[in-house]
């Protein structure tokens, strides 16, 4: 059986080691052990020829910078170029199943141009993310003002929401309409799939975690620590909730006696959110630490006391899954697919934009050992089964066989 992955991530292509390819690389390394004939096609910044390595066939998809610039306002043209490249790969490789990773990319459009069955592996879903992109009280003008009227930053941040995401949402709706098979892992993505593709076949499949997380020791309550360490991992889009971090930290600073340090990974600064909220990071013990690797993150999680996930919309954030796997107590906003991850007491859910309850439960976890250990135990119990890589690969392989047996798109 020949399987073609269409991915925005090059997985293990030209990676220095087998642990550098993120969770898709983790899955690649394990699934080839099953003897699967696997090819991966992915966007790449240089015009590399197809090659074999790591037990797979690699097909880099190259679109030149000048063409991207020339067609910056003609997004359909870029999509057409990628689809043609994918058609060429299909003609060359002749797969039995095409496995597309992520509906936010154009690759899922290929279902309209081939008789080979396509299964979409849902990651985030653009349509509901677009609806929740701006936090309450935030607008184009408030973003511009919070950026100190820096129009270049405003263009990069707000224009992406105002122009690019609506196009992505329309394209994604078309992809869902023309795709029959879907992998998902939360109640939320299953419900959204049924709305956008009513006749779809939906298969549950969890995500593999990075080796550094899987190999990590498990978290233990730090009874003797004087300073509480709070950890969050985020990125630059405003819907990721950096403003909630600042609001929650302010409440902890002004209304509790706990001494804390809140380390935020994935970003080097959140100045726009500082101006929007009127809260300075240093004034409320928040420190942006930039990007770190998986080994460093595992160590930080192990030595933290609470993980806080502030996003206004998400499906199944790997950052939450990684904290849970290690056993670090999680507080998260109950949005999108997050409630599925934190079900049955495997963490604490708070309403969206509710810094008060977030602060309350952070304080409770930091000061109530029994409560913290109860959360940790449940997280470890659920995560062990959810992220078992053998179970995940069995699920994927079974679906591949079912799709081939069905013999339909």
Regions found by a protein language model. Give the residues of each.
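Nucleotide-activated donor-binding/catalytic signature segment of Leloir-type glycosyltransferases, i.e.
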Residues: 273-295
């Amino acid at each position: 059986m020949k399987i073609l992955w269409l991915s925005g991530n090059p997985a293990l292509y030209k990676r220095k080691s087998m642990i550098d390819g993120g969770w898709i690389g983790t899955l690649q390394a394990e699934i080839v052990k099953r003897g699967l004939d696997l090819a991966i096609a992915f966007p790449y910044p240089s015009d590399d020829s197809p090659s074999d390595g790591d037990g797979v066939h690699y097909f880099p998809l190259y679109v030149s910078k000048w063409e991207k610039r020339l067609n910056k306002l003609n997004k359909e043209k870029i999509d057409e170029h990628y689809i043609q490249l994918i058609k060429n790969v299909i003609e060359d490789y002749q797969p039995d199943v095409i496995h597309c990773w992520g509906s936010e990319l154009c690759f899922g459009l290929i279902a309209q141009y081939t008789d080979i069955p396509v299964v979409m592996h849902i990651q985030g879903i653009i349509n509901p993310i677009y609806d929740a992109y701006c936090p309450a009280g935030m607008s184009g003008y408030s973003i511009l003002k919070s950026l100190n009227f820096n129009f270049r930053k405003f263009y990069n941040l707000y224009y992406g929401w105002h122009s690019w995401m609506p196009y992505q949402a329309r394209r994604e709706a078309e992809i869902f309409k023309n795709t029959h098979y879907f992998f998902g892992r939360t109640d939320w993505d299953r419900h959204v799939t049924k709305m956008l593709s009513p006749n779809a076949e939906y298969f549950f499949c969890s995500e593999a975690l990075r080796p550094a997380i899987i190999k990590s020791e498990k978290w233990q309550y730090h009874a003797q620590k004087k300073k509480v360490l709070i950890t969050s991992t985020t990125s630059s889009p405003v819907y990721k909730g950096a403003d909630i971090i600042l609001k929650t930290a302010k409440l902890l600073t002004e209304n509790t006696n706990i001494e804390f340090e809140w380390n935020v990974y994935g970003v080097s600064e959140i100045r726009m959110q500082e101006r929007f909220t009127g809260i300075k990071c240093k004034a409320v013990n928040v420190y942006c630490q930039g990007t770190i690797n998986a080994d460093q993150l595992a160590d930080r999680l192990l030595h933290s006391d609470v993980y806080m996930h502030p996003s206004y919309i998400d499906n199944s954030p790997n950052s939450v899954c990684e904290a849970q796997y290690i056993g670090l107590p999680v507080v998260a906003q109950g949005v999108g697919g997050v409630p599925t991850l934190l079900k049955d007491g495997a963490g604490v859910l708070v309403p969206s934009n509710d810094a008060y309850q977030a602060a309350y439960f952070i304080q409770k976890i930091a000061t109530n050992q029994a409560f913290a250990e109860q959360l940790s135990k449940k997280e470890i119990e659920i995560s062990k089964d959810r992220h078992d890589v053998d179970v995940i690969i069995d699920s994927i392989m079974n679906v591949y066989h079912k799709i081939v047996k069905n013999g339909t798109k």
